[in-house]
A protein has these predicted regions:
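Conserved NTP-binding catalytic cores of kinases and kinase-like/nucleotidyltransferase enzymes
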Residues: 1-109, 244
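Active-site acidic catalytic loop and adjacent metal/ATP-binding pocket
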Residues: 37-54, 58-60, 214-264
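Activation segment
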Residues: 65, 118, 247, 255-257, ...
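Short, flexible/disordered intra-domain loops and linkers
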Residues: 68-78, 127, 279-288, 359-364
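ATP-dependent phospho-/nucleotidyl transfer catalytic cores
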Residues: 72, 123-142, 148-232, 243
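Active-site activation/catalytic loop segments of kinase-like enzymes and analogous catalytic loops
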Residues: 85, 261-313, 339-356
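Conserved short submotifs of the Hanks-type protein kinase catalytic core
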Residues: 108-120
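ATP/Mg2+ or Mg2+-diphosphate-binding catalytic cores
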Residues: 321-369
Length: 369
């Protein structure tokens, strides 16, 4: 009988014993094991890094009953199972581009995954204005492979519908539908964080702009009704581990079937936030790299998507002349739209980005926002 046969929220002491029990294939040196909470560990879950004196290590991630960002948010603890299974599928579609998952535990709502502490969290690195020349190539490959290969263009339609059923979390979709695709435009639940000097601008340009509301409503309903491909679901620079020679995408708990452009738009928006931060310090070299990376990410996505489509398409009607171009035009349109909603929600919504909030000069922050 194990004390981990019933759910409870672990602390750093519990997690060492838990790791020994659940990750037994790793030859741990028990006497030298330690655990800490890493500095960057997201808004929802509880994350621990466990290691020993012989070079073995693992990340343990547990879903709590409440989200870390707000006790009012109580998404299902099943999100840990969801993330683990999505990561394993993404590893099949884009090998080596996500952390390896050692196990997931549906009782403790926890998983063990590859320790990527030899990588930087990309947002942290870009706050230091570090540059990563291969990022555009890596992230475009990841998006093309995970999005296209999980779509009806390639998959057997019955198999794809099974994945739609399997990878749906009403609680997490509800967070996206409210925090990203509604509240930044009306503050309906009084959770927005608006920078005081920008209140008049936000009221005029976001809260009172009915034409904008119409376009966001279209994007929201596309997100809710178009199960186009399996998304990472929260593909920002805080969900990317990076080194000069490699990129790994993590935090896939918001993964669901929705429009491809939601993922691609998130990447572009978060690069723009990095550009804003660089602009605030007049770092021309960094800003130039970010702009080049945005262009290369889009261009490489277009190029690779077209090539992979031709190689992998199985649906006969998707081979009809002109269909590929029509289909891809929709992805690019959605990319632009969802880049906009990400820029809005990360500026005035519940979860602001440090790229902007750490700009100390008021005029420069106003300009960035």
């Amino acid at each position: 009988m194990s004390r981990f046969d019933h759910y409870f929220q672990m602390n750093v002491d519990d997690v060492i014993e838990y790791t020994l029990e659940k990750a037994g294939e790793i030859p741990w040196d028990r006497d030298s094991m330690e655990a800490v909470v890493p500095p960057s560990h997201g808004n929802l879950n509880y994350v621990y890094r466990v290691w020993d004196g012989k070079g073995h290590s693992i990340y343990i991630k547990q879903a709590g009953t409440e989200a870390r960002i707000s006790k009012d948010m109580k998404p299902s603890r099943d999100r840990n199972r969801l993330e683990s299974e999505i990561l394993m599928l993404e590893d099949r579609f884009a090998p080596g581009m996500v952390p390896h998952v050692y196990f997931f535990d549906t009782v403790m709502c926890a998983c063990g995954m590859e320790d990527c502490s030899d990588y930087a969290v990309m947002r942290d690195a870009m706050l230091r204005h570090e540059t990563f020349p291969r990022f555009a190539d890596d992230v475009s490959t990841f998006m093309v492979n995970t999005l296209l290969l999980s779509s009806d263009i390639v998959m057997d339609h019955k198999d794809k519908k099974e994945l739609v059923r399997k990878f749906i979390s009403p609680d997490l979709c509800d967070i996206t539908e409210k925090l990203v695709l509604m509240e930044p435009y009306n503050d309906l639940n009084k959770r927005n964080n608006v920078y005081g000097p920008n209140e008049d601008f936000v009221k005029r340009e976001l809260y009172d702009d009915q034409a904008l509301h119409l376009e966001v409503a279209k994007l929201k309903f596309r997100f809710m009704t178009d199960a186009q491909a399996l998304l990472q679901g929260d593909l920002h620079t805080g969900s990317i581990f990076i080194r000069q020679d490699a990129t790994k995408i993590f935090d896939s708990e918001f993964g669901t079937y929705a429009p491809m452009g939601y993922d691609t738009g998130n990447v572009i928006a978060n690069l723009i936030f990095a550009y804003d931060n660089g602009l605030s310090t007049d770092d021309g070299m960094f800003c130039g790299w970010v702009l080049k990376t945005i262009e290369e990410t889009v261009d490489l996505f277009i190029e690779k998507f077209g090539k992979k489509y031709d190689e992998a398409v199985t649906e006969p009607m998707a081979k009809v002349k002109g269909f590929k171009e029509w289909y891809f035009d929709g992805i690019l349109r959605d990319t632009a739209g969802y880049a906009g909603t990400e820029l809005h929600r990360r500026t005035v919504g519940m979860a602001n980005v440090v790229d902007v909030t750490t700009i100390k000069d008021e005029k420069k922050r106003l300009l960035a926002e």
